């Protein structure tokens, strides 16, 4: 592993431990050249995924892009980072275990919306407004109507 401080490849693992849900291994490392300490995370990747965009272009799946888009939807919402990370892991696992190497962006969007709907209504509506390309207030009314029809609490779900 390359040291982020000096760029040396001469690093050593000082501590390894699984995260709470055991889907990721956290490693504390030290650079033997400059003594800089840093943390890395290791997770299992079942398969390389390719995303088929709406315009037909194919791009490699980017987990970080998924995290960023969810962080935007969840901004200023009472959802802990741990819950976000767990949801991302669940989504990625579902995509990887689908058996498909190529996955449409629409499929990813639907899976994300399904997970957000169970987690936080406000984040769900925010994500839906971008994903479904809302153009007018009526679009918001439709989604809000769907949520109230479910009869579920309209805040953060436990």
From Swiss-Prot:
Cofactor note: Binds 1 zinc ion.
Species of the source: Afipia carboxidovorans (strain ATCC 49405 / DSM 1227 / KCTC 32145 / OM5) (Oligotropha carboxidovorans)
Cofactor: Zn(2+)
GO biological process: negative regulation of DNA-templated transcription
Function: Negatively regulates transcription of bacterial ribonucleotide reductase nrd genes and operons by binding to NrdR-boxes.
Disordered: annotated span: 1-20
Stretches annotated zinc finger (unnamed): 3-34
Protein name: Transcriptional repressor NrdR
All residue ranges annotated as the ATP-cone domain in the record: 49-139
Family of this protein: Belongs to the NrdR family.
Keyword terms, alphabetized: ATP-binding, DNA-binding, Metal-binding, Nucleotide-binding, Repressor, Transcription, Transcription regulation, Zinc, Zinc-finger
Family matches, as PROSITE patterns: ATP_CONE
InterPro entries noted in UniProt: ATP-cone_dom, NrdR-like_N, RNR_NrdR-like
The keyword Ribosomal protein belongs to this UniProt entry's keyword annotation: no
GO molecular function terms attached to this record: ATP binding; DNA binding; zinc ion binding
Domain of life: Bacteria
Keyword Zinc (UniProt): yes
Listed HAMAP family: NrdR
């Amino acid at each position: 592993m390359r040291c982020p401080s000096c760029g040396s490849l001469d690093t050593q693992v000082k501590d390894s431990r699984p995260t709470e849900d055991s889907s990721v291994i956290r490693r504390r490392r030290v650079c033997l050249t400059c003594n800089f300490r840093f943390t890395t995370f290791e997770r299992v990747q079942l398969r390389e995924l390719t995303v088929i965009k709406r315009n037909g272009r194919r791009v490699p799946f980017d987990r970080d892009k998924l995290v960023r888009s969810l962080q935007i939807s969840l901004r200023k919402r009472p959802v802990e980072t741990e819950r976000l990370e767990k949801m991302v892991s669940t989504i990625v696992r579902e995509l990887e275990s689908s058996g498909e190497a190529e996955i449409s962006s629409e499929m990813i969007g639907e899976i994300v919306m399904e997970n957000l709907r169970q987690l936080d209504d406000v984040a769900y509506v925010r994500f839906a407004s971008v994903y479904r390309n809302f153009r007018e207030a009526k679009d918001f009314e439709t989604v809000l109507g769907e949520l109230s029809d479910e009869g579920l609490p309209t805040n953060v779900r436990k």
